[in-house]
Amino acid sequence: MWIVPASLVVVSAAEQKPEVQRLFQSGSYEQVVEAARDADPASTYLAAQALLKLNRMDGVAAEFARLKGNGPAWSLVGESGEALAANDAGRATDLARKATETDGDNPFAFYQLGLAASKAGDWGTASAAFSHAIALKADFAYAHYYGALAAQRQRQLPKAAEHFEAFLRLAPEAPERQAVQAIMRTLK
């Protein structure tokens, strides 16, 4: 029997429970938190994001802290999430960038980098990070959503429209649906 220290355990983002993402993309945030209990790190990350959307800051730090036993990249993603929740966009961006350098195949590391860079107003970095997250996990609607917002800030309206269309296709029950449809009418 082999004993592997927790700091060396690496869990792939591909091992995510698909129902957690589906619930997140439909705005069922309470159910996300329940479904992600004792789950994989990608689901735990989405639970933290759901708690942010619910403005339940007490649980956010706990969920991000749970990522720390899942390998170096997930630890950095968790630390970045904690920093972003504390409104430290610079530190959050640095930590997320390190996470992407540690595991270039983790779409949630790139998504976190996009969120942090957006908060810092670095739309070029945000757009590139969301595009990379989409390349790794094309079915993650919110990478398209925030990628569209970043593209819109850069006045790349065709790219924004493309991402918004993907978002609407992937998350037809999302709470942002009506707002996105209104934006789409102005882009056409």
Give the positions of each predicted feature.
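Short coil turns that delineate tetratricopeptide repeat
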Residues: 70-72, 104, 138, 172
